Each structure stands twice: as C-alpha cells, then as structure tokens.
C-alpha cells in the first residue's frame, strides 16, 4: 500500500477516534447536568454563596452578543481614528521590526485600549451634581438603594449622594447593560470592562474569543485569544494595559484569592496566572469551605456550557459527525489544551514604563483597597 494510502487510513482512524471521544464527552456532560441540583444541595452555605456568584457572573456574560446590538457599538466610536492608529502601529512593526509576533488583530486591540481610555470612557469617583456640575467634597454619600423593578439598563445598585452646596440628591446607578454604557460613557471598573468587551467584540467579529475575568477581591478585567501570540492576552481597559498579568500583585501590591475567566464555552480558574507572588495569595479557604467541591462544580458548569454549545449547533446543522467534530475543535480541544498548559506558565515580559500603583480611582480609595503600589 502506498504511503498516501496509509496517511488516508491514519487520518480516517484519527477522525473516528475524535468523534468517539467527543460523543463520550457529550454524553458524560449530559449526565452530569442531570445531577447538578443534587450536587448543589450537598454544598454548605459558604460554598453555595460562592458558586451562585460564579453562576451570576457567567449568566451576565451570555448577554449582548446579537449582531444588531453589536452594530450599535460601531456607530458610537470613532472608527477612522482607531484604524488610523492601527495603520500607524502596523507601519512601525514593518519599518522598525517592532513586535514581530503581533498581527493586525492585535493592533486593533491595542489601539482600542488607548482610544477607550483616553478618548471614550470616563472614570467616576463620585457623581457630578446636576446643578453645580461639581463632584468633589460637596458630594457626600447617603446610602444605597436597589434597582427598579423594570430594569432594562441592568442596574445592579444605585449609589445615593447629596450635594451639600446645592442641597439636592445625586444618584449614581451602576449600569451593566453595555448599550446604556455607550450613552453614559462613564463608571468604575465594572462599567469599563462591560462596555470595552462589547466594543471589542463588535470590532473583532463573532469568531473572536473574548472573556471576562472576575477577581473575588472586587476587580474585573478581560482577556482575548491572540492568533498572533497564540495565547490568552490580559487586557485592563481601566489602566489601558495589554499583556501585563503581573500588574495586580507586583505593581499594585494587590492581595487576591481567586480569579476566574468566563468565556463562551468554559470557565477557567486563572488565579495562578494573576496571583504572581506568594505573599499576595489570600487563602482560598477564607471564601470557600472545600476547594474540591468548587472545582467539581465548575466542571459541572462547564459541562452545561458544552451541552448548550452542541445543542445550538444542532439547531442549524443536522450532520451529527460534523457537529461532534466542531465540538471537539471549538470547545473540547481548546479547553483541554489550556488545562494542560497551566503547568507550563508563560513568562510575560514586564513593561517598565507602567506607573507604580493603580491609576484609576482617587488616592484614598486605591490605598484602602491595597492597590496603590505601597506594599
């Protein structure tokens, strides 16, 4: 038999093995989904609260991916300015042999980071009084209130203040709907990341891989998968930072316990990527009772995502083998590769021109959070 015939047979065998593996993995996930409620009922209250928070974050990130909604983002930004910056970055790479592994998509991300921070979004320490237009010592907090019953803007909480100069109430609704944030163009880290991800997804297209990163100690950022660098890249739109996972522990001096990345197809514990100094690691058992239970339940949540992804494919394509192959290539293989490569941590070069300490938020606030760079 010719070598070409052998290659064909080996390729056919490999495809059969992949299909069989994908089918077993899918059936296992379906079975796990049926047991999830029973599994949850066995957790203690501490672990239940933690898991419910993860579910809430995961569900929030399933929204606002419809193409017609994403088009709204493109109408709200200065595309000409962004692409002018992208072209400049690409020219510098070619003329100065700068950043050889970065591709055009990476330059779009870099330029959006710069544009978003410096030209589009604004940080809010305290809301501005509608009458005197001031937002300093005249604005004093008076408590918080819950969201309205009809809540299209997805308000999580309303911070209430009073302007002592004008003697009027001032409110600061914490919006989560990125379409609303395209109007307000302001907020703190949650608003910044929600709006940035929405615009980034619109710019890069539906095939791009973008995920939301949640830290248990009250910070959020995001990542995208770079086809040029072939790995997940850290992005912090509040700070305008690209590929600096050491930022929080080694620059800010922030102590953290957990960091989770929420993607379309799976949730990943990325604590080891971002908690880069042992003295900045808060004991995870301060927030949960059992590390094993948390890991097992995250596996269950990932099974849910896998089943949902396959079900959505099956709605539009009836070829089972083709769907199973796609499931393997688009979900199982990527997830398994990241789990396997967690042991081989990539050393990311530190950018020395980043200022010390957190740059967003006033000095008193960043100091109270242990993010001012003074260890």
Protein language model features and the residues they cover:
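Generic recognition of flexible, low-complexity loop/linker segments
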Residues: 196-197, 208-211, 248
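Catalytic nucleophile-His microenvironment captured as a short glycine-rich beta-strand/loop
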Residues: 197-201, 218-228
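Alpha-helical and coiled-coil interaction segments, frequently adjacent to or embedded
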Residues: 1-191, 214, 229-375
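Short N-terminal edge-element motif at the start of the domain
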Residues: 185-203
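Short, well-structured beta-strand/strand-turn elements
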Residues: 201-217
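Hydrophobic/aromatic-lined pockets within catalytic cores
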Residues: 117, 121, 200-205, 226
